[in-house]
Amino acid sequence: SASEALNKNCGAGELSPTDSWSWEDTRHSEHIMIKSLEKTEPGKIIAAALDGDGDRCLLIESTDKGCRVIDGDEMADHILRGAKGDWTLAASIESDLALSTSLSRLDANVEFIQTAVGDRWLSDALKNSTSNKIGVEDSGHIVLSAPNPNGGRCLVGDGAASLLATLCAMAVSEKPDKFTRGFKKRVSIKDTKRELWDGKNSLAEDVEEIIKSSLGDLQRKKIVGESNLLLLEGKGVSLGIRNSGTQAKTNVSLRVRANVNPEPPLQAMDEVIKFLNKHLV
Protein backbone atom coordinates (compact mmCIF):
# COMPACT_ATOMS: atom_id res chain seq x y z
CA SER A 1 0.00 0.00 0.00
CA ALA A 2 0.99 3.66 -0.27
CA SER A 3 1.36 3.95 3.51
CA GLU A 4 3.66 0.93 3.66
CA ALA A 5 5.79 2.36 0.85
CA LEU A 6 6.01 5.71 2.64
CA ASN A 7 7.23 4.14 5.90
CA LYS A 8 9.30 1.23 4.61
CA ASN A 9 12.71 1.11 6.30
CA CYS A 10 12.40 4.63 7.68
CA GLY A 11 10.73 6.61 10.43
CA ALA A 12 9.75 5.84 14.01
CA GLY A 13 7.39 3.09 12.89
CA GLU A 14 10.38 0.86 12.11
CA LEU A 15 12.02 1.44 15.51
CA SER A 16 11.40 -0.13 18.91
CA PRO A 17 11.72 1.83 22.18
CA THR A 18 14.45 -0.56 23.36
CA ASP A 19 16.52 -0.66 20.14
CA SER A 20 20.27 -0.12 20.24
CA TRP A 21 23.07 -0.68 17.74
CA SER A 22 26.85 -0.92 17.60
CA TRP A 23 28.46 1.33 14.99
CA GLU A 24 29.08 -1.83 12.96
CA ASP A 25 25.37 -2.68 13.19
CA THR A 26 24.37 0.73 11.86
CA ARG A 27 26.33 0.19 8.65
CA HIS A 28 24.29 -2.94 7.90
CA SER A 29 20.91 -1.67 9.09
CA GLU A 30 18.00 -1.67 6.64
CA HIS A 31 16.67 1.48 8.31
CA ILE A 32 17.68 4.39 6.08
CA MET A 33 18.26 6.84 8.94
CA ILE A 34 20.19 4.40 11.14
CA LYS A 35 22.37 3.34 8.20
CA SER A 36 23.28 6.99 7.52
CA LEU A 37 24.58 7.71 11.04
CA GLU A 38 28.27 8.48 11.48
CA LYS A 39 30.39 7.49 14.46
CA THR A 40 30.75 10.22 17.08
CA GLU A 41 31.46 10.68 20.78
CA PRO A 42 28.86 9.35 23.24
CA GLY A 43 26.01 11.35 24.74
CA LYS A 44 24.93 13.34 21.67
CA ILE A 45 21.47 13.50 20.10
CA ILE A 46 22.31 12.52 16.53
CA ALA A 47 18.92 11.84 14.92
CA ALA A 48 15.16 12.00 15.33
CA ALA A 49 12.41 10.04 13.59
CA LEU A 50 8.70 10.73 13.19
CA ASP A 51 6.14 8.09 12.25
CA GLY A 52 3.97 8.12 9.14
CA ASP A 53 1.25 10.44 10.43
CA GLY A 54 3.65 12.59 12.43
CA ASP A 55 2.21 12.13 15.91
CA ARG A 56 5.12 10.07 17.28
CA CYS A 57 8.79 10.94 17.70
CA LEU A 58 11.80 8.94 18.83
CA LEU A 59 15.33 10.30 19.29
CA ILE A 60 18.67 8.59 18.67
CA GLU A 61 21.55 9.12 21.12
CA SER A 62 25.18 8.11 20.60
CA THR A 63 26.64 5.70 23.18
CA ASP A 64 30.12 4.38 24.01
CA LYS A 65 29.81 1.64 21.38
CA GLY A 66 27.12 2.88 19.01
CA CYS A 67 23.71 4.44 19.44
CA ARG A 68 20.31 3.80 20.99
CA VAL A 69 16.70 4.94 20.93
CA ILE A 70 15.54 7.55 23.43
CA ASP A 71 11.92 6.53 23.82
CA GLY A 72 8.82 8.50 24.76
CA ASP A 73 9.30 7.84 28.48
CA GLU A 74 12.79 9.37 28.45
CA MET A 75 11.60 12.31 26.34
CA ALA A 76 8.84 13.02 28.86
CA ASP A 77 11.37 12.71 31.68
CA HIS A 78 13.59 15.33 30.04
CA ILE A 79 10.60 17.69 29.80
CA LEU A 80 9.57 17.11 33.42
CA ARG A 81 13.14 17.52 34.71
CA GLY A 82 13.20 20.99 33.22
CA ALA A 83 9.76 21.87 34.57
CA LYS A 84 8.49 23.79 37.60
CA GLY A 85 5.07 24.13 39.21
CA ASP A 86 2.13 21.72 39.16
CA TRP A 87 1.90 19.04 36.48
CA THR A 88 -0.24 16.04 35.62
CA LEU A 89 1.55 13.11 33.96
CA ALA A 90 -0.50 10.46 32.16
CA ALA A 91 1.40 7.35 31.05
CA SER A 92 0.16 4.09 29.59
CA ILE A 93 0.43 0.64 31.13
CA GLU A 94 3.43 0.02 28.85
CA SER A 95 5.52 2.94 30.15
CA ASP A 96 8.61 2.40 32.29
CA LEU A 97 7.76 1.89 35.98
CA ALA A 98 10.84 3.90 36.91
CA LEU A 99 9.29 7.06 35.45
CA SER A 100 6.11 7.02 37.52
CA THR A 101 7.71 5.74 40.74
CA SER A 102 10.50 8.34 40.94
CA LEU A 103 8.58 11.60 40.51
CA SER A 104 9.64 12.88 43.95
CA ARG A 105 13.14 13.64 42.54
CA LEU A 106 11.67 16.35 40.30
CA ASP A 107 11.39 20.05 41.14
CA ALA A 108 7.87 20.03 39.69
CA ASN A 109 4.92 18.72 41.71
CA VAL A 110 3.62 15.88 39.51
CA GLU A 111 0.35 13.97 39.81
CA PHE A 112 0.43 10.60 38.01
CA ILE A 113 -2.39 8.82 36.14
CA GLN A 114 -1.95 5.38 34.55
CA THR A 115 -3.94 4.84 31.36
CA ALA A 116 -4.88 2.33 28.70
CA VAL A 117 -2.71 1.95 25.59
CA GLY A 118 -3.38 4.62 22.96
CA ASP A 119 -2.84 8.37 22.89
CA ARG A 120 -6.59 9.03 23.04
CA TRP A 121 -6.58 7.60 26.58
CA LEU A 122 -3.75 9.95 27.51
CA SER A 123 -5.86 12.88 26.35
CA ASP A 124 -8.92 11.53 28.14
CA ALA A 125 -6.99 11.32 31.43
CA LEU A 126 -5.59 14.83 31.07
CA LYS A 127 -8.63 16.72 29.80
CA ASN A 128 -9.94 17.79 33.22
CA SER A 129 -6.58 18.63 34.79
CA THR A 130 -6.09 22.29 35.70
CA SER A 131 -2.29 21.99 35.97
CA ASN A 132 0.34 21.70 33.25
CA LYS A 133 -0.18 18.50 31.28
CA ILE A 134 1.91 15.82 29.59
CA GLY A 135 0.91 12.37 28.38
CA VAL A 136 3.35 9.72 27.20
CA GLU A 137 3.72 6.29 25.67
CA ASP A 138 7.13 4.70 25.25
CA SER A 139 6.41 4.36 21.52
CA GLY A 140 6.94 8.11 21.20
CA HIS A 141 3.41 9.44 21.58
CA ILE A 142 3.63 12.62 23.69
CA VAL A 143 0.51 14.68 24.36
CA LEU A 144 1.03 18.32 25.30
CA SER A 145 -1.12 21.40 25.84
CA ALA A 146 -1.25 23.81 22.89
CA PRO A 147 -3.14 26.98 21.93
CA ASN A 148 -6.55 26.31 20.39
CA PRO A 149 -7.11 28.31 17.17
CA ASN A 150 -10.63 29.06 18.43
CA GLY A 151 -9.44 30.29 21.81
CA GLY A 152 -8.27 28.61 24.99
CA ARG A 153 -6.07 25.53 24.89
CA CYS A 154 -6.31 21.97 23.62
CA LEU A 155 -4.36 18.70 23.84
CA VAL A 156 -2.18 17.81 20.85
CA GLY A 157 -0.01 14.84 19.92
CA ASP A 158 2.52 16.30 17.48
CA GLY A 159 5.85 14.58 16.88
CA ALA A 160 7.64 17.74 15.73
CA ALA A 161 6.38 19.70 18.76
CA SER A 162 7.48 16.84 21.04
CA LEU A 163 10.93 16.94 19.45
CA LEU A 164 11.30 20.68 20.00
CA ALA A 165 9.95 20.53 23.57
CA THR A 166 12.40 17.75 24.44
CA LEU A 167 15.40 19.53 22.92
CA CYS A 168 14.50 22.76 24.76
CA ALA A 169 14.18 20.84 28.04
CA MET A 170 17.56 19.17 27.44
CA ALA A 171 19.12 22.63 27.20
CA VAL A 172 18.08 23.51 30.78
CA SER A 173 21.38 23.67 32.67
CA GLU A 174 20.41 22.87 36.26
CA LYS A 175 17.87 20.10 36.75
CA PRO A 176 17.27 16.89 38.73
CA ASP A 177 18.84 13.56 37.78
CA LYS A 178 17.22 11.47 35.07
CA PHE A 179 15.37 8.32 36.07
CA THR A 180 17.15 4.95 35.96
CA ARG A 181 15.47 2.86 33.31
CA GLY A 182 13.80 -0.30 34.50
CA PHE A 183 13.40 -3.64 32.73
CA LYS A 184 10.68 -4.23 30.15
CA LYS A 185 9.74 -7.24 28.06
CA ARG A 186 6.75 -7.85 25.81
CA VAL A 187 5.79 -11.12 24.17
CA SER A 188 2.97 -11.55 21.64
CA ILE A 189 1.31 -14.95 21.59
CA LYS A 190 0.18 -15.32 17.98
CA ASP A 191 -2.89 -17.01 16.49
CA THR A 192 -4.83 -16.89 19.76
CA LYS A 193 -8.57 -17.38 20.11
CA ARG A 194 -9.09 -13.95 21.65
CA GLU A 195 -12.69 -14.67 22.63
CA LEU A 196 -11.37 -17.11 25.24
CA TRP A 197 -9.58 -14.31 27.12
CA ASP A 198 -11.47 -11.47 28.79
CA GLY A 199 -9.20 -10.76 31.77
CA LYS A 200 -11.91 -11.79 34.25
CA ASN A 201 -12.90 -15.41 33.52
CA SER A 202 -11.61 -18.64 35.04
CA LEU A 203 -8.65 -18.61 32.65
CA ALA A 204 -7.65 -15.19 33.98
CA GLU A 205 -8.05 -16.44 37.55
CA ASP A 206 -5.70 -19.35 36.76
CA VAL A 207 -3.13 -16.92 35.34
CA GLU A 208 -3.46 -14.69 38.40
CA GLU A 209 -2.79 -17.70 40.64
CA ILE A 210 0.31 -18.63 38.60
CA ILE A 211 1.68 -15.10 38.99
CA LYS A 212 0.89 -14.78 42.70
CA SER A 213 2.37 -18.19 43.51
CA SER A 214 5.68 -16.96 42.08
CA LEU A 215 5.69 -13.28 43.03
CA GLY A 216 3.44 -13.00 46.08
CA ASP A 217 0.28 -11.01 46.62
CA LEU A 218 0.30 -8.49 43.78
CA GLN A 219 -2.74 -6.25 43.41
CA ARG A 220 -5.14 -6.42 40.47
CA LYS A 221 -5.59 -2.99 38.85
CA LYS A 222 -8.43 -1.82 36.61
CA ILE A 223 -7.70 0.59 33.77
CA VAL A 224 -10.41 2.50 31.90
CA GLY A 225 -10.39 1.47 28.24
CA GLU A 226 -8.77 -1.94 28.79
CA SER A 227 -11.79 -4.23 29.10
CA ASN A 228 -9.88 -7.52 28.71
CA LEU A 229 -6.75 -6.56 30.64
CA LEU A 230 -5.46 -8.55 33.61
CA LEU A 231 -2.96 -6.24 35.31
CA LEU A 232 -1.16 -7.24 38.51
CA GLU A 233 1.16 -4.76 40.21
CA GLY A 234 3.22 -4.38 43.37
CA LYS A 235 6.73 -4.69 44.81
CA GLY A 236 8.23 -2.87 41.81
CA VAL A 237 6.70 -5.32 39.33
CA SER A 238 3.87 -4.98 36.81
CA LEU A 239 2.63 -7.90 34.71
CA GLY A 240 -0.22 -7.44 32.24
CA ILE A 241 -2.07 -9.66 29.76
CA ARG A 242 -4.35 -8.17 27.10
CA ASN A 243 -5.69 -9.04 23.66
CA SER A 244 -4.59 -7.14 20.60
CA GLY A 245 -7.41 -4.95 19.36
CA THR A 246 -6.73 -5.66 15.69
CA GLN A 247 -4.87 -8.97 15.35
CA ALA A 248 -5.30 -12.56 16.51
CA LYS A 249 -2.72 -12.31 19.27
CA THR A 250 -2.56 -11.86 23.03
CA ASN A 251 0.18 -9.73 24.54
CA VAL A 252 2.04 -10.36 27.79
CA SER A 253 3.92 -7.32 29.15
CA LEU A 254 6.37 -7.27 32.05
CA ARG A 255 7.77 -4.13 33.68
CA VAL A 256 10.26 -4.19 36.55
CA ARG A 257 11.65 -1.22 38.48
CA ALA A 258 15.41 -0.62 38.21
CA ASN A 259 16.28 -1.79 41.75
CA VAL A 260 14.27 -5.04 41.54
CA ASN A 261 15.72 -8.37 40.35
CA PRO A 262 13.92 -9.19 37.06
CA GLU A 263 14.63 -12.93 37.14
CA PRO A 264 11.67 -14.09 39.32
CA PRO A 265 9.18 -11.97 37.31
CA LEU A 266 10.69 -13.31 34.08
CA GLN A 267 10.18 -16.87 35.30
CA ALA A 268 6.56 -16.07 36.16
CA MET A 269 6.11 -14.50 32.73
CA ASP A 270 7.45 -17.64 31.04
CA GLU A 271 5.01 -19.80 33.00
CA VAL A 272 2.11 -17.56 31.97
CA ILE A 273 3.14 -17.68 28.30
CA LYS A 274 3.33 -21.49 28.35
CA PHE A 275 -0.08 -21.68 30.00
CA LEU A 276 -1.69 -19.29 27.51
CA ASN A 277 -0.11 -21.04 24.54
CA LYS A 278 -1.74 -24.23 25.76
CA HIS A 279 -5.21 -22.72 26.32
CA LEU A 280 -5.54 -19.93 23.73
CA VAL A 281 -3.78 -21.26 20.63
Q: Could you say what each language-model-derived stretch is?
A:
Residues 63-66, 149-150:
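Short glycine-enriched, charge-decorated loop/helix-capping segments at active-site entrances
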Residues 37-41, 80-84, 232:
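Alpha-helix C-terminal capping segments
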Residues 17-21, 67-71, 90, 113, ...:
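Alpha-helix capping and helix-loop boundary segments enriched in small/acidic/polar residues
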Residues 46, 52, 85-281:
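Phosphate-binding and adjacent anionic-ligand microenvironments
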Residues 1-62:
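N-terminal small/polar loop signature for handling phosphorylated ligands or for N-terminal nucleophile
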Residues 65-84:
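Cysteine protease catalytic core and zymogen-processing segment of caspase-like enzymes
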